């Protein structure tokens, strides 16, 4: 039916939006891991000022890249990672109330706590490592929540496919039975 295909399309759109956000967060996660490597490297007092400045420059560029990812990750013209994709409902069934809520937190460098990190000294690099680990935890938690939603949607889609197939099969059997009954009646009446 048209309603079932509309629901199916909305479910597929939900999966697609989640996959777009998850892909972007995967990249953010990789950037944070690189930032952690750099902070660990900077936490070594054998570094010269030139070394630490080079590390700081890369840290700043990586933080800016997190912000770029946050501001450019969209699905159907909607920003996914700027905090505005919150409390969104996805209709997953043909009836009212059959929906799943999706919320994605703001994933910019400031919101996850890695904006303006300094690695200019042993102690600031150590502090940066702590903040980066916390950011990794925030991103991982959001990714886990999205993964759970995606699994739920995929199970719902499989169930909708199953219900649709079983309904079609039942309708076919009913039509076949009706046709057989009509043939018997026709034969009886024409003898």
Where are these regions (language model features)?
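Primary detection of the long, small/polar-rich alpha-helical "axial" segments characteristic
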Residues: 1, 5-191
């Amino acid at each position: 039916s048209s309603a079932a295909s509309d629901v199916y399309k909305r479910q597929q759109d939900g999966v697609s939006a989640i996959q777009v956000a998850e892909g972007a967060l995967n990249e953010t996660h990789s950037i944070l891991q690189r930032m952690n490597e750099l902070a660990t490297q900077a936490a070594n007092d054998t570094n010269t000022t030139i070394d630490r400045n080079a590390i700081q420059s890369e840290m700043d560029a990586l933080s800016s890249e997190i912000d770029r990812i946050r501001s450019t990750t969209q699905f159907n013209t909607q920003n996914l990672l700027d905090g505005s994709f919150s409390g969104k409902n996805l209709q997953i069934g043909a009836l009212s109330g059959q929906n799943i809520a999706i919320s994605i937190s703001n994933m910019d460098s400031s919101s996850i706590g890695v904006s303006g990190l300094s690695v200019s000294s042993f102690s600031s690099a150590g502090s940066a490592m702590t903040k980066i680990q916390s950011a990794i935890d925030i991103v991982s938690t959001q990714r886990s929540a999205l993964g759970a939603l995606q699994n739920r949607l995929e199970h719902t889609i499989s169930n909708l496919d199953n219900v649709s197939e079983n309904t079609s099969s039942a309708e076919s059997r009913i039509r076949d039975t009706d046709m057989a009954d009509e043939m018997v009646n026709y034969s009886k009446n024409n003898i």
